[in-house]
A protein has these predicted regions:
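ATP/NTP phosphate-donor binding region
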Residues: 1-65
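N-terminal amphipathic/basic leader segments beginning at the initiator methionine
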Residues: 1-22, 159, 165-181, 318
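N-terminal glycine-rich "phosphate-gripper" loop used for MgATP/nucleotide binding
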Residues: 68-84, 103
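Short, acidic/small-residue loops that bind anionic groups at enzyme active sites
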Residues: 87-112, 116, 120-127, 286
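Conserved anion/nucleotide-ligand pocket segment
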Residues: 120-203
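Internal helical hairpin/lid segments
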Residues: 210-265
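ATP/nucleoside-binding phosphotransfer catalytic cores, i.e., glycine-rich phosphate-binding loops
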Residues: 255-322
Length: 322
């Protein structure tokens, strides 16, 4: 199953060039035709080239005819250039079957594409972090399997198990949303159908609020993740989305992985679970946790902007979009 994969850098400059080369080599060894953008290793300040260079890279990716347009890494930089993206060109590429894949700062591109065109992109790996590790380490099996499923057109959903604390919370949501047509049962069993799956990195998404690049999704399934953000900062960004009315317009909030932060003595017991508990007290919709997506090795791929169905039975959750 050979695919044409176009690798480009729309955000931060590639810092680990060895990992970049290893990622290219791995994808090539899998039988794929890997095309590297001419500016993939460009550098300007902390960016992969100046704004014009990175815009041109996006447009070259869209015009490449590749099956997959895969970012080299995240970082920062896409919010600077959202106003210059040729969204009609990107939409044409998506309509022809191109799969735009990325994570982290790529949330800005995905949100803007959804807001401006309704096009579906994929939250998933970047080249370096997912495929660029040094031997004997190998790409995570679950991530690699999901990536293969995407390339073969076989990916139809993702399942996971919430931590034990989620059992009671899931059961509570059945009463809250019982006025909606859904399957209910013991232990917090319910389903939510025909809802737009959207979201990504919480910091990036919240930074777009109030702009024309923030998707106006109602009755959606909002998934969120972040890295190196203390729980109080996560709560602050969630509060912004809450006060703006975004969270109350969704059918469910699905929290992924929030990693690489450090608690301090001043927190006095305040932790990520405190944020989850607070969020559940503020909204009248299910709040699920532990989605295997974020700045972690083990992650699923998610279609941003696609209609999806959420099934929950006790601690077990499943997203279907196929």
């Amino acid at each position: 199953m050979s695919k044409h994969i176009y690798v480009y850098s729309p955000s931060g400059a590639v810092r680990d060039k060895a990992a970049f080369r290893r990622g290219i080599k791995r994808l090539t060894a899998l039988g794929h035709q890997v095309e590297v953008d001419e500016a993939a290793l460009a550098s300007h300040l902390r960016f992969a080239g100046d704004d014009a260079t990175r815009l041109a890279a996006i447009h070259r990716a869209a015009a490449s005819g590749a099956d997959v347009a895969l970012i080299s890494r995240g970082g920062y930089g896409l919010t600077r250039i959202l106003g210059g993206i040729q969204y009609k060109q990107v939409a044409r590429a998506i309509n022809k079957g191109m799969l735009f894949v990325g994570i982290s700062d790529f949330t800005a591109f995905q949100s803007a594409v959804l807001a401006r065109t309704g096009g579906v992109t994929w939250a998933g790996p970047s080249l370096g972090e997912a495929f660029g590790m040094a031997a004997p380490a190998q790409p995570d099996e679950i991530m690699a399997a999901c990536f293969d499923d995407l390339l073969s057109g076989q990916g139809e959903g993702a399942g996971w198990r919430q931590p034990a604390e989620g059992r009671a919370a899931a059961a509570d949501t059945t009463k809250i949303i019982a006025n909606k047509p859904m399957n209910t049962g013991p232990g917090g069993t319910f389903s939510i159908k025909k809802s737009t799956l959207w979201g990504g990195n919480l910091t990036v998404l919240s930074s777009l609020l109030g702009s024309p690049y923030f998707p106006q999704v109602k009755h959606g399934l909002l998934f969120l993740e972040d890295v190196a953000e203390h729980p109080y900062r996560i709560e602050r960004m969630l509060t912004q989305l809450l006060h703006a009315g975004v969270l109350g317009q969704q059918r469910a909030i699905i929290l992924g992985q929030f990693t690489d932060y450090k608690l301090v003595p001043h927190d006095r017991g305040y932790k990520l679970q405190s944020v989850v508990d607070w969020l559940r007290s503020q909204v009248k919709i299910p709040v699920l946790t532990n989605l295997p997506f974020g700045h972690v090795a083990t992650k699923v791929l998610l279609p941003v902007g696609a209609p999806a169905q959420l099934l929950v039975e006790g601690r077990d959750a499943m997203l279907y979009w196929g």
